[in-house]
Amino acid sequence: MLTEAAHWLEQNYDAEPFFRVVESFDPHEPWFVPEWYRRQYDDNESHEQVISSYRDVRDISPAVLRRSRANYSGLVTMCDRWFGHLYATLAALGKLDDTLVIVTSDHGHSIGDRNYMGKRGYPSAPEVYDVPVLIRHPRGIGAGTRCDLLVQHQDIAATILELAGVPAPQPLDGHPFWRRAVEERKPLRDHVTVAWGSAITVIDERWWLNIKVNGKGAFLHDLSAPNAFETNLTDRHPEVVQNLFQKGVADAHGKFPPYILEMAEQQADAPGCSALVPRV
């Protein structure tokens, strides 16, 4: 996909202005990666593992876990190489001086983090939820700047429109964050809510609450504490749980659909890209 995007740029080098979205999909399971990339991280001859097991890794052999991590890392390296090709094509065509480049992802993946392999919405974890947003301004504005604003994916569209000087054709759910991140260094919002199947995660500057939509089974973590996700502070701070949960309910316009509430009662966790898939 990245090479096709580079080819498109060459074919449309004189297109002005242009907007191009490139969905590489990788690095994503199944982790089919050329052997030469995988061998940079695991050179052993062992059982192949390209599918995430969605289970506790303490029941998985060290060799399988090592191979899973190697295949994932190999895919990251492969994508890095071909994104470099796309970036070099922009440079060769003289596009970098007037083109905004944004790199992000929709989610991450646990490969042994917190003894789990997979991605899930309950319990939630930062290696799945906390994704990077990298922005290169054509004039180098803000180069090297890092920030920890509470930003969500819908904010990216609003930011693109603002930087391009294009008025939004209709009200947007997102908020432009460029100036907050680079110039003002002010918070964009006081919390974010992420919904995944039958659970929500509400995050503010200090707290991370993961809770089912029926208000049960809360996990509360203090982000200011070392090893924050090793301790569930729900019983110590019930008022924080209630406050954040109510913010999440408000973000859902005050209520959840009955079938989601029913699912929250029935399911112990929420694995996979969607907790809405039927259990076998």
Annotate the PLM regions.
Residues 1-280:
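Catalytic domains that recognize anionic headgroups
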